[in-house]
Amino acid sequence: MSMWRPSDSKVYLPPVPVSKVVSTDEYVSRTSIYYHAGSSRLLAVGHPYYAVKKGNNKVSVPKVSGLQYRVFRVRLPDPNKFGLPDANFYDPNTQRLVWACLGVEVGRGQPLGVGTSGHPLLNKLDDTENGPKVAGGQGADNRECVSMDYKQTQLCMLGCKPPVGEHWGKGNPCTTGAAGDCPALELVNSVIQDGDMVDTGYGAMDFNALQANKSDVPIDICTSVCKYPDYLKMASDPYGDSLFFYLRREQMFVRHLFNRAGTMGDSVPDDLYIKGSGSNVKLASHVFYPTPSGSMVTSDAQLFNKPYWLQKAQGHNNGICWGNQVFLTVVDTTRSTNMTLCASTASTVTTPYNNESFKEYLRHVEEFDLQFIFQLCKVTLNTEVMAYIHSMDASILEDWNFGLQPPPSGSLQDTYRFVTSAAITCQKPAPPKEKEDPLAKYTFWEVDLKEKFSADLDQFPLGRKFLLQAGMRARPTLRAPKRTASSTSSSSPRKRKRTKR
């Protein structure tokens, strides 16, 4: 007798439907009003390797390096409170105004140059590229003074939220190990702040937590965290606020090959080599590492000092500056020259030359000029748009003075007669709390452009470039006066007509 039985294969149910993320072009209307905004000359001066501190542990000279991220937090004026030439082109009862970034140009001053770094006590044992036939044994301290140049990086990222970086940090192992065991690794995501170190060629990692000897890398990163932009995470952001677009150029080659001194934590398996005799009985250090180099610096491969136009962003946010702010992240190691300064310890220079009569200093300078082109846009506030914006970021509606109305209170309220009496509690109303900045705990280079907007695009270099590429013409300011016709009659008398008698 045949019997029916269900199939043994698994049944897959369809996924639960989720709300769809739409592009800002579907609910943001563009206008024909454009503005130029530019910063003043932005300068930074400091020590390229570390912050110089005084006796009270207060920083007297900050750390300013060409290998640092420069994260500019650009503040924009509120377009709903902006003095517009025509205030009737939108309805404030049903619409709100926002800025859209159309163009950006990062101006870089200072000449091209290569900055070097190093360590006076670097963990360098042997030259493994051109090493001796018989490697010498390790001593108690084999550290040497070594300097190098770093990987070459040019980077520019634009978004309305801070960029996200990644690095490898020290993780928590499942079991407690013994002293000297290799630490567990964990991929860490964090916000890239102004002053964070870039990847120099030694990896994106927390050197302070993963290198206890403080001698495996140069002194400017041996106690720092080198971060690398997490392009995968920012590209997969559903709203695309952290990364409208980015420009990147990286290059590196290996200059020298060394190995590390110390006890080898991982032994070479016996099946990978044939044991030797004599001086080759004991293997040399097999922890090899290179010294990176960024190679030649040339003006032919520069990403800066030229305009870039945003026609279509890579995410759903097509350049809309939510929160009236823009985050511009810049890295440029092609201008990382470290200037050497010398000061005499004596009032007059004496002869013969004596090294102790002079003090040597290092300083690095950074120079920026930021220019933007912004377009004024309108958002029509219907039920669907407001619900979508609230699910995306509720603070946007709060900044637009939209909020939930509190329910009516039915409880009995207490009212005192003598409000200034010392016998009762203080009746002064509590001051309203200021809106907290969710990014106050991070460090950014603040650039305020609230009073630097101008509609005269032809008065600025980037504005003229925008008018040229957009096929627009500036309004003429000088016009030739029109000649008016003379109201006086001609001086010559009219001829009388002859009449027959």
Curated annotation (Swiss-Prot):
Domain of life: Viruses
Residues covered by region (Disordered): 473-501
Molecular function in Gene Ontology: structural molecule activity
Family classification: Belongs to the papillomaviridae L1 protein family.
Function: Forms an icosahedral capsid with a T=7 symmetry and a 50 nm diameter. The capsid is composed of 72 pentamers linked to each other by disulfide bonds and associated with L2 proteins. Binds to heparan sulfate proteoglycans on cell surface of basal layer keratinocytes to provide initial virion attachment. This binding mediates a conformational change in the virus capsid that facilitates efficient infection. The virion enters the host cell via endocytosis. During virus trafficking, L1 protein dissociates from the viral DNA and the genomic DNA is released to the host nucleus.
Transmembrane annotation, as ranges: none
Subunit structure: Self-assembles into homopentamers. The capsid has an icosahedral symmetry and consists of 72 capsomers, with each capsomer being a pentamer of L1. Interacts with the minor capsid protein L2; this interaction is necessary for viral genome encapsidation. Interacts with protein E2; this interaction enhances E2-dependent replication and transcription activation.
InterPro entries on file: Capsid_L1_Papillomavir, Capsid_L1_sf_Papillomavir, dsDNA_vir_gr_I_capsid
Protein name: Major capsid protein L1
A single cellular component GO annotation: T=7 icosahedral viral capsid
Biased composition (Low complexity): 483-492
Pfam families xrefs: Late_protein_L1
Organism: Macaca mulata papillomavirus 1 (Rhpv 1)
Main location class: virion
GO biological process, one term: endocytosis involved in viral entry into host cell
Location in or out of the cell: Virion; Host nucleus
Keywords: Capsid protein, Disulfide bond, Host nucleus, Host-virus interaction, Late protein, T=7 icosahedral capsid protein, Viral attachment to host cell, Viral penetration into host cytoplasm, Virion, Virus endocytosis by host, Virus entry into host cell
